[in-house]
Amino acid sequence: MLQGALDKFTRDITASAREGKIDPVSGRDTEIRQMVDILSRRRKNNPILVGDPGVGKTALVEGLALRIVEGNVPESLRPVTLRTLDLGLLQAGAGVKGEFEQRLKNVIDAVQLSPAPVLLFIDEAHTLIGAGNQAGGADAANLLKPALARGELRTIAATTWSEYKQYLERDAALERRFQMVKVDEPDDETACLMLRSLKSRYAEHHNVHITDEAVRAAVTLSRRYLTERQLPDKAVDLLDTAAARVRMSLDTVPEQLTRIRSQLASLGMEKQALLEDIAVGHQNHGERLSAIEQEENVLMTARDDLEQQYARECELTGELLESRSDISRQSETHHLQQALHDIQQNQPLLSVDVDVRTVAGVVADWTGVPLSSLMKDEQTELLHLEKDIGRRVVGQDVALESIAQRLRAAKTGLTSGNGPQEVFLLVGPSGVGKTETALALADVMYGGEKSLITINLSEYQEPHTVSQLKGSPPGYVGYGQGGILTEAVRKRPYSVVLLDEVEKAHRDVLNLFYQVFDRGFMRDGEGREIDFRNTVILMTSNLGSDLLMQQLSEKPETTESELHELIRPLLRDHFQPALLARFQTVIYRPLTPSAMRTIVEMKLAQVCERLHCHYGLSTSVDERVYDALTSACLLPDTGARNVESLLNQQLLPVLSRQLLSHMAAKQKPQALALAWSDEDGMVIELRQECAL
């Protein structure tokens, strides 16, 4: 009967290990050794594995079972059977008072009386507290305590940090019967080792080859972009999904081809509906029908090209998989691989292996980060960093060069590595590109502007607002909800943090950043350490902008070092010297007329692009328009912001009115011409054709 209780309410992990049903466990030798040390004690020989979800606590127990089967454990543990207790089965159907307690007592007695020693594994150990605790009954934890203390019931428990703190720490009598084994998230090298040990199992299951580059990419990309979860769990899921996607691509029609076929089908349905309307005498849909026909022609051409490519890829893939199975055809395999690569040209419809691109594609679908950003070569990108940012930030070459040099040093590991990647204070007049620099950096370095965390410090002018940034302390309203800054960085540790208008913040708020700039950590309201070491922190300020503009208007050839000397006393008066020494100051100069003209051209090009996107208009702009707008924007106190203001006040209202007039008259404009007249100012001419 007692053996029946064991078979009914527990599962034999060592039996599964003997049958080869457990995946190999690597990279956890230290933790398994700690467990063996504790299990070999005479009394209170009960380890409890504590770690974040997904770090591999259950896998540790499976690793111990594999070692027991292999005999790679001390003599006292070799005859041991490792069983996992299922509390759900214990509770299911235990409707009568005392039945749950009797079942658990039977399991405890069966373990103690078993001829072969039994180790009991209790996953989610916090569920012991309160389990079965009906009115007048005792919970599972209280039934286990005596046996645990005497060492008669050797138990391995597992739980997360939050549940350990919430349940087990409060029950000191239960906590002292367990010895904690901390299970931390592995570093990248250890995580790669873990995935390599599992790779063959997943390759065999999906019947695909997984490259070693894919393993490394799964670890690095999951750590960088799947920040809510822990390694190795998230990397394993990523690799598993990528392998499933490769298998599916070999067995089904590619997504690109399916998408085009769906678009053609939807256009066909719309065309049929319009023809039915015309047949019963409704209004003429000739314009839309001709547009549908043009779209269909484009899509059909794309579909035919894809079908030809797909057929050729299928043929080559079949030959390649066949040649791989014969080791004597290695040279042929290489030629087929090269031929397939030449056909695909970085736009593959089929994937033969799980490679970096496949893994990056899964991450792109999960996170929304563009695939092109995930596949960037970071080394090449760093070499051209100032050029990439300079496409958006005009006229600040010296400042961008200074930022790029410091970031290159940080990224190549030449700096100390204690604090954030870099901390910059961007000083200069309003509208010269300081905030745009942060947007461009987030886009270039971290895959998009969504990686920019913006905190406007003008909202933090009182000392009590510190709690909004880092979270309320215990006992205060809002405790447990996290802080605006700490939660944003915890969820997206690879990001650009923009502290806008830093000179307006209260000094107590600035004191918060001493340790962030120095060590790269901030402790939030709940006591968790938030890691800032992968962030780039930019602060913007208008301090000294009047001095800068006055000096540069009088002496345009003033050097950077002279400008730094000019504003240093002002910065030292406002920021404490200890804080000032923790970041690099970068000076942004007022925009020159040539830089302003470039910005005017960029802004007008964006307007033209929107017009073409929404209305199909082709736009021509007279050179005098650029000259007139540039001269009107050369106000030193507003910078490039005046360009947007002028366009919103002078161009867009008139243009929108004319567009609405043409649309109301059922006329479709084809082209827009922008000119400048000394008498009338901006001249807008829409050339249209009458509606059919």
Predicted regions and their residues:
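AAA+ P-loop NTPase nucleotide-binding core of proteostasis motors
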Residues: 1-692
